[in-house]
Swiss-Prot record:
EC number, as in UniProt: 4.2.1.33
Residues in coiled coil: none
Gene3D superfamilies: Aconitase, domain 4
Any GO BP: L-leucine biosynthetic process
Name this polypeptide is given: 3-isopropylmalate dehydratase small subunit
């Protein structure tokens, strides 16, 4: 998993509440267990028309936001089913941070496991970030994880809270496998000792 230290990028405003995981990645994309290639399916029912052409009115199809790294979203983002394909699709599209007032619990946890930083802010701060994001090509935010701070294009800041363990994992690029590998020396030592003491096993 890639480390998350400081992220600077365009923020796309998605002013929709209760965005569920089925909207993030529809069911027809769940047949694969590969994490790559799902970016095309991200918000596909909003991004594409019935004939397969792009919907020019959807935010991620607008030229200013095609390369967005940050998503500023309405309340209760990621509610619904537990599909881990939702954060996979966001990550494959290029989004590494989602900012909202609240998240679906399972989606929130899955984000951390996949290197995405979900940030909870107050409604007042979200409204301010929506204003920043609506600047289009000038909608650049900086996410400073070490200092738990969002910096806007005018230099304004928004502080955020994050669990210390999850912060450690993101800063060091540690997923579940990475955390296990941190203890490799202790695991090897235990296995060597077990082989000596229970050679019969």
């Amino acid at each position: 998993m890639d480390k998350f230290t400081t992220l600077e990028g365009v923020a796309a405003p998605l002013k929709i509440i209760n965005v569920d995981t089925d909207m993030i990645i529809p069911k027809q994309y769940l047949k694969t267990i590969k994490r790559t290639g799902l970016g095309r399916g991200l918000f596909s029912e909003q991004r594409y028309r019935d004939d397969g052409s792009e919907n020019p009115d959807f935010v991620l199809n607008k030229s200013a936001y095609r390369n967005a790294r940050i998503l500023v979203a309405g309340d209760n983002f990621g509610c619904g089913s537990s599909r881990e394909h939702a954060p996979w699709a966001l990550l494959d599209f290029g989004i590494r941070c989602v900012i909202s007032t609240s998240f679906g619990d399972i989606f929130y946890n899955n984000c951390f496991k996949n290197g995405i930083l979900p940030i909870r802010v107050t409604q007042a701060d979200l409204d301010k970030l929506f204003d920043d994001a609506e600047r289009g090509a000038n909608a650049t935010l900086t996410i400073d994880l070490a200092n738990q701070e969002i910096r806007g294009p005018d230099g304004g800041t928004v502080k955020f809270e994050i669990d210390a363990f999850r912060k450690h994992c993101l800063l060091n690029g540690l997923d579940d496998i990475g955390l296990t590998m941190e203890k490799k020396a202790a695991i090897d030592s235990y296995e060597d000792k077990a082989k000596r003491e229970r050679a019969w096993a």
